[in-house]
Amino acid sequence: MKHTQSGQSTSPLVIDYTCRVCQMAFVFSSLIPLLLMTPVFCLGNTSECFQNFSQSHKCILMHSPPSAMAELPPSANTSVCSTLYFYGIAIFLGSFVLSLLTIMVLLIRAQTLYKKFVKSTGFLGSEQWAVIHIVDQRVRFYPVAFFCCWGPAVILMIIKLTKPQDTKLHMALYVLQALTATSQGLLNCGVYGWTQHKFHQLKQEARRDADTQTPLLCSQKRFYSRGLNSLESTLTFPASTSTIF
């Protein structure tokens, strides 16, 4: 009885703490990119680092290689412009690695919690193992979708650090990263839709199996498969988190 009362008294505190952490994470995730890129905009404009070059794509932020510094006006501070160029690349690569690791940690954590929840019921039937398999695939697909979206841009940044001169490979990566960097939401929706389709198939198979089973087996199967419907709402948080990143 004491354990139940203490659990009920601490539950609102835990919920309030979780809400505050989520609000702080939302605010910081909005402010940190602005704070990190403020030196690039401020110092870049005062030092005249960004302007229209002879090649149209060189005016894009973070895509002006050191070789383009020769086209800057005499009043431009080349040392500041070069420092801002490498600073922008470092921020981009660091954000990519941090976002990828965060997505993987959140999804693996959700996968672990769900496995503990299923195993706590004391029964692992065919449906439970099928759902666990879908969750495992989902944990792999979201990081793969994130890497497919931002991988070409990361490869382009790394190649430009080693070979600043523009080549045909650079132009191909320019076009590829322009297409993939804007398709993260589309790929996330594809992974989410595929997962929901698999859940729907499991429900259809459960209904077909129920038609060929005895009343006792039907009641047992309904009892042990109650967690299937609650899983869809439980896994919506990793989906929205991955889309935000």
From Swiss-Prot:
Subcellular location: Membrane
Biological process according to GO: signal transduction
Keyword flag Cell inner membrane: no
Alphabetical UniProt keywords: Membrane, Transmembrane, Transmembrane helix
TM helices/strands, residue ranges: 24-44, 88-108, 141-161, 173-195
GO CC aspect terms: membrane
Membrane topology field: Multi-pass membrane protein
Taxonomic superkingdom: Eukaryota
Keyword Transmembrane helix attached: yes
Main location: membrane
PANTHER family: G PROTEIN-COUPLED RECEPTOR 157-RELATED, TRANSMEMBRANE PROTEIN 116
Name the record gives this protein: Transmembrane protein 116
Organism annotation: Homo sapiens
